[in-house]
């Protein structure tokens, strides 16, 4: 079935390596790694396919003050990436799936399997050798995570924290917090080895650890390609279209 894509009038040039597949991404290290991950998945099936990753700064990257609960279900982290797709500067947009609003600017053509849905609590490494304080200072911006933390640590002081993984780890290291919450998928993708962690119990975000891929043209071709290659796990992507 893959041979059909070599004859597809739109996809053939990508599959044959005649032109680059241009992927839009946020600028963070994690976002760029996710774009490379998408590219590698396709290259398993189309070895001659090659790509260019074009990054942009999103509103969510520039605004480090607004609580995430105030921008839930908006394009805070996705609209600027999808603008590159809609304007024809890129062919596909690569997103963390849980950043998607209900009605994204571009059309979702694939949602991948999660590499790990779990949340982890990352403690300051000093707690490898000393007991945890009774009133933990925990950094988290997610309403869902805050509710869980309040049950697990009733005496904890839970404070908003924003920024890239590296920024949040720096805040932890500088002792602004005793612990911070992270997605284990992000830690894995970045190849981080964190010495003092605890896996939090469910519930987890249903899209955590998944990538969402968006397009603005040739939607049927892209959806067929990702589905045939086994890259799409969640076939109910029409709910985001």
UniProtKB/Swiss-Prot annotation:
| Role according to the record | Tetrapolymerization of the monopyrrole PBG into the hydroxymethylbilane pre-uroporphyrinogen in several discrete steps.
Q: Which PANTHER family has this protein been placed in?
A: PORPHOBILINOGEN DEAMINASE
User: In which family does this protein belong, per the annotation?
Assistant: Belongs to the HMBS family.
Q: What is this protein called?
A: Probable porphobilinogen deaminase
Task: Give the catalytic activity.
Answer: 4 porphobilinogen + H2O = hydroxymethylbilane + 4 NH4(+)
Show the GO MF annotations: hydroxymethylbilane synthase activity
Q: Which gene carries the instructions for this protein?
A: hemC
Q: Which Pfam families match?
A: Porphobil_deam (PF01379)
